[in-house]
C-alpha cells in the first residue's frame, strides 16, 4: 500500500493484533516483492485493487489478498462509531482484543520487518521490535516538541523505515496529525496539501526537495516549521538554494533501517532570555538522539578515535534492531558486542555533532588512496554551478590502479571537457578527478523507490557503457 490513511490504519491494526507487518516495496517489481514475501514467509497481503490498477502491479504468486477498498465498503456507521469510542476511551488491551490479538503484544515482539533498500547490495530483512520503534518515536518527540495542532506530511513510502516510523508511529504516539499522499513526486498536489492543511513538518529526501524547488510556489510552503531531509546526503548547495527559494532551511538527519531508523538529527536552535543553544551545524547531521550513543573507531582495529577524527561509526541504543531475518551470519557481522556497525565513515566534533563523510562502500581505492565519491560529486556540482542533482559517481575496476571513477550525468556531454578543466583548478587531488571520457549521459539519475540514489544501477549503467574504454 502507498502512503495513505488506509495503509497507516492497516499497519496499526495489524500491530494491535500482535501481527508482524512487512510493507512490500512495490517499486521493486514482482520479483523483488516475491523475494521479500518468500523470505518473510508471507501468506496474506493487504492491498487495494485501485492501487494495483493505477500502479500496474501484479501480486506475487502464493499470496492471498485482502482487498482494503472492499473491506472499507462494508464498514457501517455503527462500526465507525464503535471504533471511535474504542480509540478515544478504551484501554489498549481492549483495542488489541478488538483487532484480534490472541495475547498482549510484548515490547520485544517484532512489529515489522523492513527490507533494506538494496542500494549497495541485496536487500536484507531488518527485524524491528515494538521497543525499537517506540524508543525512536519518544526521542523524536523530545527534540521536536510537537503539538496536537501540528501536522506532518506523509509522503515517504511505508517500506522506507523513515516513512514507517515518522509518518505512522510518531504521529500515533505523539498526537501529531498526519496528512498522506501516495506519490512523493506529485509536486503540485504536495504544494496544495501543505497549503490547505497548514502542514508544519515536511520529511523528504534531498532528491524530492530538488523536485519541489522546480514545481512548487514559495507561498505554498509558508506554514512549514521544520523541513527534515534524510536517506541521502543533503548538500550545502541544495540546502542554500531551498532556503533562498522557500525561506526555510532544510535540516539534515541521519539514520539506518537497522536503527528504526533515526540515529541523529539536526533540530531548531533553542533560544530563551540569556540562553542560546545551536541545534544544527553546517555540514553536520545533528547530534545523536536521546538514548542513542555513537562511537567513531578505527575500521581495522575498532579502537576509539579522538574527536574530529574520521573513522567507522558504531551505534548503540534501544532503537538498534533485533537482527536480520533468517540471516544470523549477517546479524553477527552487523552487531558487534551490542554496537551496530553502520559501514559509514564519520566524525564526532567536541560537542558531539556528527558528520558523515560517506559510506565505506562509496569510496574507491585508486592507486592505494581512498577517494570519496560524495566529495567528487560535491565538487562537480560546484563546478557546474547547479543546485539540483546532476552527477552520480561510481567506480569501475581498473587493471593499473585497482579502480577508476565513472560519472553518470544528466548534463550534455559536450560540456564535460570544460567542466573537467574547471574541476582540475578547484584544488582537488589528481586522483579525485574523473577523466572526460568517464562520463555517461543519462536521461535521469537512477533512484530507488525510497528516494535514495540507486548505486547498484549506477554501477551497472557505467559498466555497460564504459567497460570497453
Language model regions located:
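Conserved AMP-binding/adenylate-forming
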Residues: 1-28, 155-157, 370
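Structural core segment of the AMP-binding/adenylate-forming
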Residues: 16-87, 411-415
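AMP-binding/adenylate-forming catalytic core of the ANL superfamily
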Residues: 45, 202, 317, 322-323, ...
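Conserved pre-ATP/AMP-binding loop-to-beta segment of ANL
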Residues: 65-115, 122, 145-151
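AMP-binding/adenylate-forming catalytic domain of the ANL superfamily
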Residues: 68-69, 403, 428-453
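Gly/Ser/Thr-rich phosphate-binding loop
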Residues: 80-84, 88-89, 199-204, 213-280, ...
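Conserved AMP-binding/adenylation subdomain of ANL enzymes
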Residues: 134-151, 159-200, 215
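Conserved ATP/PPi-binding loop(s) of AMP-dependent carboxylate-activating enzymes
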Residues: 271, 284-291, 301-333, 369-371
Amino acid at each position: 500500500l502507498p502512503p495513505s490513511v488506509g495503509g497507516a490504519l492497516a499497519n496499526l491494526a495489524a500491530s494491535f493484533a500482535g501481527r508482524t507487518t512487512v510493507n512490500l516495496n512495490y517499486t521493486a517489481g514482482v520479483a523483488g516483492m516475491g523475494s521479500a514475501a518468500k523470505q518473510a514467509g508471507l501468506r496474506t497481503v493487504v492491498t487495494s485493487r485501485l492501487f494495483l490498477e493505477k500502479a500496474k502491479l501484479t501480486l506475487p504468486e502464493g499470496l492471498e489478498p485482502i482487498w482494503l477498498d472492499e473491506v472499507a465498503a462494508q464498514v457501517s456507521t455503527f462500526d465507525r462509531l464503535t471504533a471511535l469510542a474504542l480509540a478515544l476511551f478504551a484501554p489498549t488491551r481492549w483495542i488489541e482484543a478488538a483487532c484480534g490479538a490472541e495475547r498482549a503484544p510484548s515490547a520485544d515482539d517484532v512489529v515489522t520487518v523492513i527490507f533494506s533498500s538494496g542500494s549497495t547490495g541485496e536487500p536484507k530483512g531488518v527485524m524491528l521490535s515494538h521497543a525499537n520503534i517506540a524508543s525512536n518515536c519518544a526521542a523524536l518527540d523530545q527534540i521536536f516538541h510537537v503539538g496536537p495542532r501540528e501536522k506532518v506530511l506523509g509522503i515517504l513510502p511505508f517500506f522506507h523505515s523513515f516513512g514507517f516510523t515518522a509518518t505512522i508511529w510518531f504521529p500515533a504516539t505523539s498526537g501529531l496529525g498526519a496528512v498522506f499522499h501516495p506519490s512523493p513526486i506529485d509536486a503540485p498536489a504536495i504544494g496544495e496539501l501543505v497549503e490547505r492543511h497548514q502542514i508544519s513538518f515536511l520529511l523528504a529526501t534531498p532528491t524530492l526537495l530538488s523536485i519541489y524547488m522546480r514545481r512548487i510556489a514559495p507561498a505554498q510552503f509558508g506554514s512549514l516549521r521544520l523541513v527534515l531531509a534524510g536517506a541521502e546526503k543533503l548538500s550545502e548547495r541544495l540546502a542554500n538554494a531551498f532556503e533562498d527559494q522557500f525561506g526555510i532551511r532544510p535540516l539534515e538527519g541521519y539514520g539506518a533501517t537497522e536503527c528504526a531508523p533515526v540515529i541523529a538529527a539536526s533540530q531548531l536552535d533553542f533560544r530563551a532570555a540569556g540562553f542560546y543553544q545551536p541545534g544544527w551545524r553546517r555540514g553536520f547531521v545533528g547530534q545523536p538522539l536521546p538514548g542513542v550513543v555513537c562511537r567513531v573507531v578505527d575500521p581495522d582495529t575498532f579502537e576509539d578515535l579522538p574527536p574530529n577524527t574520521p573513522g567507522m561509526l558504531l551505534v548503540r541504543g534501544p532503537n538498534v534492531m533485533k537482527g536480520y531475518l533468517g540471516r544470523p551470519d549477517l546479524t553477527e557481522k552487523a552487531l558487534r558486542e551490542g554496537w551496530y556497525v553502520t559501514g559509514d565513515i564519520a566524525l564526532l566534533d567536541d560537542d558531539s555533532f556528527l558528520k558523515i563523510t560517506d559510506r565505506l562502500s562509496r569510496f574507491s581505492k585508486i592507486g592505494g588512496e581512498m577517494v570519496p565519491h560524495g566529495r567528487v560529486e560535491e565538487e562537480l556540482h560546484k563546478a557546474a554551478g547547479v543546485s539540483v542533482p546532476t552527477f552520480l559517481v561510481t567506480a569501475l575496476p581498473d587493471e593499473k590502479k585497482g579502480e577508476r571513477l565513472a560519472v553518470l550525468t544528466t548534463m550534455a556531454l559536450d560540456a564535460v571537457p570544460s567542466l573537467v578543466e574547471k574541476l582540475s583548478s578547484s584544488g582537488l587531488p589528481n586522483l579525485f578527478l574523473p577523466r572526460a571520457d568517464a562520463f555517461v549521459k543519462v536521461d535521469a539519475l537512477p533512484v530507488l523507490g525510497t528516494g535514495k540514489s540507486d548505486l547498484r544501477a549506477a554501477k551497472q549503467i557505467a559498466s555497460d557503457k564504459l567497460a570497453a574504454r
